Amino acid sequence: MEEIQPNEWTITLNVSTLEFPLSYKFVACNADSKQVEEWENHDNRMLNNPELKKGEIYLTPETEVHFTSSARKVAGTAIPVFSLRSEKSFGVGDFGDLKKLIDWAAKTHQQAVQILPINDTTITHTWMDSYPYNSISIYAFHPMYIDLNQLGKMKDKEALAVFEARRQELNALPQIDYEAVNNAKRAYLKVMFQQTGRKVLASAEFKKFFEENEHWLLPYAAFSYLRDLYGTPDFSQWPEHTEYKAEEIAALCAPDSSCYEEIAFYYYTKYHLHIQLLDAGNYAREKGIIFKGDTPIGISRNSVEAWIEPYYFNMNGQAGAPPDAFSVNGQNWGFPTYNWEVMEQDNYQWWQKRFRKMAEYFTAYRIDHILGFFRIWEIPSHSVHGLLGQFVPALPMSVDEIQSYGLPFQKDFMTKPFINEEMLNKMFGDKAAFVKETFVQHAHDDIYEMRPEYDTQRKVEAYFSDKKDEESIHIREGVYALISNVLFVPDRKHPSMYHPRIAVQNDFIFGRLDWKEKDAFNRLYNHYYYQRHNQFWYQEAMKKLPILTQATSMLVCGEDLGMVPDCVPWVMDQLQILSLEIQRMPKNPKHEFGHVWEYPYRSVCTISTHDMSTLRGWWEEDYEQTCRYYNHVMGHWGEVPVSAPGWVCEEIVRHHLECPSLLCILSFQDWLSIDEEIRYPDVNAERINVPANPRHYWRYRMHLTLEELIKNKKFNEKLVEMIDTTGRF
C-alpha cells in the first residue's frame, strides 16, 4: 500500500485477477525489513464481486483498522512551559527544562507531555502579555522560553555575575515576575547577540533555517522592530508601513538597512528557539513520549498575520464563547474572526502551513475551541461581555418565523435595551439616581433609554477606565447588563433578521413576557440553539477539518467543551479526532458528573484544565456538590473532608487512569495532589487561569524543581505503580 497523504493509504488492484468473494485483512509491516509484525485482530473483511465492466473503477474506502497494539492506553502530564522550574532556569520555564520534564515523564512510565501555546505574545512589554493565547505570530516562539545556558559562555565575567545574581533572585520567586524575567532575559540575549550573533548568522545551519522560514521570519522581525519603534503594536497607528508591502519590508530588513542590527537580533533569537524546541521534540520521540502542542483558535488583532494577511480575518468582530461554566457573561477573547470564505479559496493554506510547521516539533496537538471550526461566537466590537454575540455562520430568523411560534414581534421592545424604574432601583439601590443622571435618560412613563454617549459597553468601559474601586465596578457591570437586556440581536449582515439573545431567560426583559410569550420564546430559543443548525454546521466543519487534520501525521485532539452542538461528535467520530472528557463537565446534560467508565476510547481524559480550578481547588468550591460527589461517585459515606486529603485525590486519579480513554493527561498539580508531603500547601496559588477575568495574570510556577521531582523516589514509584496497574504502560 502507498501512503498518499498523512494517515491515508491506498492500493489499486486489477479485479480480473481476483477470486470472489474476497477475504482480506490489513497487516502492519516493519518499515525497514518489510516483514509482517502484526495482523488485524478482527473478523476477515469481505468483498463481493462488484461485476465491473471494462474501464470501470470500484472504490471501497476503509475508515478503521483493528490492531491490538493500537488499542494501548497512555498516561501523561499537562503543564505550561512557563510553569516549569529547574535549578538553572531564569525565573521561568524554558525549552531546556522540557527535556527534564520528559525525563521525569519517562521515569514514571508516562508517555505523553502536553503544553500550552508557546508563541510570542509581546504586545505591551508588560504582564498583560502573559496571556499565551493572544499571539502576535503563529510561527514565532516567545523569547522568554529560550534556554540561555545553551547559548554558550558569556565572555564578560562582570556582566555574567550580575545576570547570575538576577537569575537566582527571579528563580527563587514563588510565581513568575513576567516583566522582570523578560527584561532580564532580553538583556542577556542582547549581550550574547553581540558576542556570537555574526558567527551564528553566517553559519550554514542558520542560512538553511532562514531559507525555510523567511516567509514568516522577515515580517515578524519587521513587525517587532516597528512595534517598539512606534510604541504600539497597532499597525493602523504607525506613521509608516500601516499597510504591509513586501518590497518595503524587504528593504527595511536588508543587511544594508540602518536598522538591520535590530532586525537580525530577532533572527538570532528565533533561530535558537527553533533548534532548542526541535531538540526537545526529538528527545521526546527518542524516549517514546508523545509531545503534544496547543493551537489557539485566534490571533491578536495586532499581530503579524493581521498585518500581512488581513484578507483572512474579519476585523470588525471579536471572537469569544457564549455563557458556560467558566463565565456567566460569556467570554470575549478579542480576537478577529476568520474569513472562511477567503480561506477556502486556497484550500486553507494558512492553516495547513501552520500545522505543518507544528509537526516539526510535536507528535500531537490540541485544537483549542474546535467548535470554532463549526461556528464561532462573534461579538460586536462595541461589546465587552459576550451576551450580545451571535454564531457565525448561522441561520437568522425572520420576523415572520419568530411570529410563527406565537410570539408577536415588537422591534423596539425586543431589540433595544429594556430599562424601567423598577430595574434601576433593584440593580443599583441608592446609586440609581446617579445612574439615571449619568448613563440613561427618561423616554416615557417609567421607561428609560441609554444616553447616546453611553449606549455601548465600550463607551461605558472608557468612562470607568480609571475607576477601580468595588462600587464603581459594581455600577459598571450593572450598566453593561442594562445594555445587554434585549430579547433579540440583529444579524450582522442582514439587520432585518434576528438571533435570540443567548441566556436571556435570567434577565429582566424576559420577566416582562406573559406565560404564553415565554413559552413561545423558549420553543424558538431551544430550536434555534439546539436543532436548527446541526446539518448546516456539520457541512461547515466538513469543509475545513478533513483537509486540516490530514495535513500532517500528528494525532489530533479537540477541545470540545462549552455549548456543544449535536453535530460536533458526528464530525469528530468521522475524522477520528480525540474528544476531551472532564468529569465535572459531563457531555450528558442529565448527569451532574461524567461517568469515567463510559468515556470513548478516542478521547483525552483529564480532571482539570488550565481554565479550571485544580482537583483540590474544585473540592473546596462547593461543599454540597463535593458531598454528592463523595457519596454518589466515590461511594463513600460519613463526614466529608472540607479539604481533599491525599487518599481522596489518589482514588480520583486512579479512577481516571482506569477509564477507557486512549490518553489520560492530568495537570501537574493534580498528579501532585495525591501526596500530602510534596503538594503545594496553597491550593489557590496552583490555579493557572480564571477565564471570567480577561485581565488575569498567567504566572503559576511549580514549587518543586524538576531535579527534586526526578529524585523523589517514593512519589515516582507510586506513579509507576498506578500507571502500570491501570494498563497505561
Language model regions located:
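Aromatic-rich carbohydrate-binding modules that target alpha-glucans
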Residues: M1-F20, V27-L52, F90
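Catalytic cores of glycan-processing enzymes that make or break glycosidic bonds
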Residues: T12-T17, N44-F729
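Short, conserved beta-strand segments within well-ordered enzyme catalytic domains
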Residues: K25-V27, Q114
